[in-house]
Amino acid sequence: MAVIESVGANTTVEAGGLISPSPPSSVTSQESGASSNNDHGGNGIHDEIGVHVARSDGGESFKRDMRELHELLSKLNPMAKEFIPPSLTKPVVNGFNGGFFAVNNGFVAAGNFPVNEDGSFRRKKSFGQQGKRRMNPRTSLAQREEIIRRTVYVSDIDQQVTEEQLAGLFIGFGQVVDCRICGDPNSVLRFAFIEFTDEVGARTALNLSGTMLGFYPVKVMPSKTAIAPVNPTFLPRTEDEREMCARTIYCTNIDKKLTQTDIKLFFESVCGEVYRLRLLGDYHHPTRIGFVEFVMAESAIAALNCSGVLLGSLPIRVSPSKTPVRSRAIPRHQMH
């Protein structure tokens, strides 16, 4: 049985989309000022010590101590990664071997990444909604710009790569707050935005540009936009709804001339049986969006390959849904 629903004007739409990508801008560092202030503060202390020692032995003891301190500091590695206890880490990917690692779907990626002894990426926490506060209409311009500096734009993403796998590639370079993949109607590949908790993680992630993920090397650049937040009331509330999300896709740029049956038959002929279909639109937009829930999760994964396919007169955009398709009081159509 398949349930098809259509919602007309004045309907609330999932706020899970992305701000359209644009050519990236350079990211500036704000660390030099703090470093300079620390240096100036330290010189005053050293001068006081130097005067005191010079009065006692002509400054030889002070010079000797400074040479020993300089020798100790010279042996430190300023680029060393923070030590993370093994109890706080768990493998993101497996199969690490000789600079290569296999993601869950069998793809292979290459690169030099910081890893633990068991071959997993070194990280603090898995990515999610923790960390920095998400943007909302009241977010100040300064906060918005700060979020953008913590975000990178990733292009040329293989259709079979999931958000979890993409985040797993970047999580070794900083804590990931959010990862959002979107389909590109003009390409068989996709693009994404990844937000880190700090600017250091975003700058370090730029080194991953050119890394093989799936069958294509990804491109990583600073972002000019930030990830649009998802309305928390739409997010899955139970384990059953999370399972529903795994079987659901979010489809945009749908030709208004297409009927519900047209869309259902298209996805069933290419991907698998459709359990529920909901279309949303109004009179003000030239296209519609839809949520397609399949009977099997494998069908939803296969549907991601349809992004960019011409359906009617427009190429559709397909991405994984972050929200389940919840039942209305009375479905308009039921198809067996």
UniProtKB/Swiss-Prot annotation:
What Gene3D superfamilies does the entry give? 3.30.70.330
In which tissues or organs does this protein occur?
Answer: Expressed in roots, leaves, stems, flowers and siliques. Detected in flowers only in growing organs: gynoecium, petals, stamenal filaments, anther walls and ovules.
Q: Does the keyword Nucleus apply?
A: yes
Task: Read off the PROSITE patterns from this record.
Answer: RRM
What are the Polar residues biased-composition ranges? 25-40
- Residue positions of motif Bipartite nuclear localization signal: 122-134
- Major location (coarse): nucleus
Q: Which UniProt keywords apply?
A: Nucleotide-binding, Nucleus, Repeat, RNA-binding
Which segments constitute the RRM domain? Answer: 150-225, 247-323
Q: Where is this motif: PAM2-like?
A: 75-85
Q: Which GO terms describe its molecular function?
A: mRNA binding; nucleotide binding; RNA binding
Q: Where is this region: Disordered?
A: 14-47
CDD domains, sorted = RRM1_CID8_like, RRM2_CID8_like
Where is the protein situated, by its record's location annotation?
Nucleus
The UniProt entry's GO CC annotations, sorted and at most eight, read: nucleus
> What does the UniProt function comment say about this protein?
Binds nucleotic acids in vitro.
Q: How does it assemble?
A: Interacts with MPC.
Note on domains (UniProt): Contains a PAM2-like motif, which seems to be involved in the binding to the PABC/CTC domain of PAB proteins.
PANTHER family (alphabetical) = POLYADENYLATE-BINDING PROTEIN-INTERACTING PROTEIN 12 (PTHR32343:SF30), SERINE/ARGININE-RICH SPLICING FACTOR (PTHR32343)
The protein's name is: Polyadenylate-binding protein-interacting protein 12
Tell me what organism the protein belongs to. Arabidopsis thaliana
